[in-house]
């Protein structure tokens, strides 16, 4: 049972997780990637460049947490956010489904917030935390690199064209 949360805490943490999933995915996956894909439409490697750039910006957006948690925890969070942002960006571009990354982001934050009872990182970093970050780097980084080749890359390139309006199909025509 979640009886360690203050009164109204479950609802508040659920709303905060929902806001993060909805707002951050709309901003960094939908808007930011759309702008970067369009801005770099003539750059041959725009796909990996946009994915990395949006993920770096997503990580740095967590600098705002310096106002409510220690610097070392915030910089650790930036690393995790960068890697998660890269994974979510790849999922979004591969599937073309923003709702999926919103759900994934909400779920991750929701379970984390409920498990700790807060939206902030607390405690002290231990060597295991840094090992976990390295493991995330290998998993999410390796997955992202793997997605850049073969049919997976072609699917993402096709979705980029659709997401940026370069390859729209409306399914109708006007005949006179």
Question: Which residues does each predicted region cover?
Answer:
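Aromatic-anchored segments of alpha-helical transmembrane domains
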Residues: 1, 55-64, 106-118
């Amino acid at each position: 049972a979640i009886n360690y949360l203050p009164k109204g805490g479950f609802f508040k943490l659920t709303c905060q997780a929902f806001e993060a999933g909805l707002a951050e995915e709309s901003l960094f996956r939908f808007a930011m990637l759309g702008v970067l894909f369009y801005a770099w439409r003539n750059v041959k490697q725009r796909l990996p460049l946009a994915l990395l750039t949006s993920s770096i910006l997503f990580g740095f957006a967590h600098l705002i947490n310096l106002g409510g948690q220690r610097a070392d925890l915030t910089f650790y969070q930036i690393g995790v956010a960068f890697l998660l942002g890269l994974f979510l960006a790849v999922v979004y571009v591969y599937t073309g489904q923003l709702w999926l990354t919103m759900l994934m982001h909400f779920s991750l934050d929701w379970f984390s917030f409920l498990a700790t009872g807060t939206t902030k990182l607390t405690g002290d970093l231990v060597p295991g935390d840094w090992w976990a970050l390295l493991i995330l780097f290998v998993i999410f980084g390796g997955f992202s690199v793997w997605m850049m080749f073969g049919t997976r890359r072609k699917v993402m390139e096709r979705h980029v064209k659709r997401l940026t309006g370069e390859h729209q199909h409306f399914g109708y025509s006007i005949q006179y």
